[in-house]
Amino acid sequence: MRTSRRDPGSFVKRAASHESILHFLLMNQAHIHLIVNHVPILGSLFALLLLGAGLVMRSEILTKAGLVAVLAAGLLCLPAQLTGEGAAEIVQDMPRVSRALIQNHAAAAEKGFWALESAAALALFSLLLFKSASPRARLLALLTLVVATLSFGLLARAGNLGGQIRHTEIRDGFGTPDEL
């Protein structure tokens, strides 16, 4: 008869996974912001490429998928926007962190946020027009593509400005004395 023995490493693995969960639950807004801020940038890029492909190929299925992706990117932008102020409060007094960079990033992020939310609203209206087989659905989807492209550009700029807050190596001139 064979006795089953537990692998001594399994306790360590379970403890590590519980520690990871606990660490996740105890993250501050700066941690969360760093994790979620890439989603709207990459999401809007994916969405505009999918929507653009659908419109160019005149594929209603791809166009609708692109519109849903724009809508999803708009929803997923909310956590990044909601954690930004808390993240700023945490890092603003750290060494080599410029309040001017934080303010520039916040202003750029707000513009990108509202552009993406506008694109998401247009995407929702486009989907409703597609559902009712309106001839204007494609035109509104094209307008959604234009606004989604604008939002991607604004969000990418905001992301670059946000990266400069802690990554001095990407600042122009590697950080000037007035930024320190």
Question: What are these language model-derived features?
Answer:
Residues 2-6, 14:
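Basic polycationic patches enriched in arginine
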Residues 7-10, 173:
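Intrinsically disordered, low-complexity segments enriched in small/polar residues
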Residues 11-26:
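Short, Lys/Arg-enriched N-terminal segments with co-localized hydrophobic residues
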